[in-house]
């Protein structure tokens, strides 16, 4: 009976190694891509949270915010206008 429990203990110890070996190259690569994706998303969320925290600590006056927003809208408008103007059908 002691040998049976020792065998099942051995199986538990080697199972993760066997499972990892049976995954193969393709699945390991997809796990790496998933981990890379999650790392990138985590970094972006952290950066966004830090930016939000900084903006709450140093709030910008409303007039300055409005000027920045208008500048962004103008830039976007000019960008789309230039794109449409280059159509040479």
UniProtKB/Swiss-Prot annotation:
<feature type="region of interest" description="Disordered">
    <location>
        <begin position="1"/>
        <end position="31"/>
    </location>
</feature>
<protein>
    <recommendedName>
        <fullName>Putative protein T-ENOL</fullName>
    </recommendedName>
</protein>
<feature type="region of interest" description="Disordered">
    <location>
        <begin position="54"/>
        <end position="89"/>
    </location>
</feature>
């Amino acid at each position: 009976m002691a040998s049976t429990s020792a065998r099942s203990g051995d199986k538990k110890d080697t199972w993760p190694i066997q499972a990892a070996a049976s995954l193969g190259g393709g699945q390991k690569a997809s796990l790496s891509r998933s981990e890379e994706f999650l790392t990138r998303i985590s970094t972006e969320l952290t950066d966004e949270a830090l930016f939000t925290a900084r903006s709450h600590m140093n709030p910008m006056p409303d007039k300055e915010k409005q000027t920045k927003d208008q500048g962004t809208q103008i830039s976007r408008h000019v960008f789309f206008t230039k794109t449409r103007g280059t159509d040479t059908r």
